Curated annotation (Swiss-Prot):
Forms part of the ribosomal stalk, playing a central role in the interaction of the ribosome with GTP-bound translation factors. Pfam families: Ribosomal_L10. This is Large ribosomal subunit protein uL10. One of its GO terms (molecular function) is large ribosomal subunit rRNA binding. The keyword rRNA-binding applies. Keywords: Ribonucleoprotein, Ribosomal protein, RNA-binding, rRNA-binding. Belongs to the universal ribosomal protein uL10 family.
Length: 169
């Protein structure tokens, strides 16, 4: 890489840090090109990205973006995975790492909070934002359904009492 290109790369990585509330740092040593492309495609379908970064440039960009805490994560062959949706991204990366021993999750950052490998694996077990929204909507609709049932119950009970009375006579 030419010296003149490095500031542009630092700016690109810094903008990724600023625009993406969640970033996972991983070592990719031993991944084949087809495996990396497969991971990129699955991430792209979830509006996430995968970028191989040079450690020194990633550290400079992290400092520039105010993420000094993740500088220590950059060593060895490093890539960053970034997204606006942390849970979906974590699920994809953790599942890929399970099936591919050559991808090692080092750590990451979600909403400016540094996470270690274990925390990212725990994050991947959480429901996604869309799943949470659907559960909340279901919970909000359930009381309305119950209220409708309760309101209908007295009229149907009255009808049964009248029917029972009529059948006695």
């Amino acid at each position: 890489m030419l010296r003149s290109e490095k500031p542009e790369v630092v700016e690109e990585i810094a903008s990724i840090y600023k625009d993406s509330p969640s970033v996972i740092v991983a070592h990719y040593h031993g991944l084949t090109v087809s495996e990396v492309n497969s991971l990129r495609e699955s991430l792209k379908s979830k509006d996430a990205g995968f970028k191989v970064v040079k450690n020194t440039l990633a550290k400079i960009a992290a400092n520039k973006a105010g993420l000094d805490d993740i500088v220590s994560l950059f060593s060895g062959p490093t890539a960053i995975v970034y997204s606006k949706e942390p849970v979906e991204m974590a699920k994809l990366v953790v599942n890929f790492a399970k099936s591919n021993e050559n991808l090692k999750i080092v750590g990451g950052i979600v909403d400016k909070q540094v996470l270690n490998e274990h925390s990212i694996k725990e994050l991947s077990k959480l429901p996604s934002l869309n799943e949470l929204r659907s559960k909340i909507v279901g919970l909000l609709q359930a009381p309305a359904t119950k209220i409708a049932g309760v309101l209908q119950a007295p009229s149907s009970s009255l009808a049964r009492v009248i029917q029972a009375n009529a059948s006695k006579n």
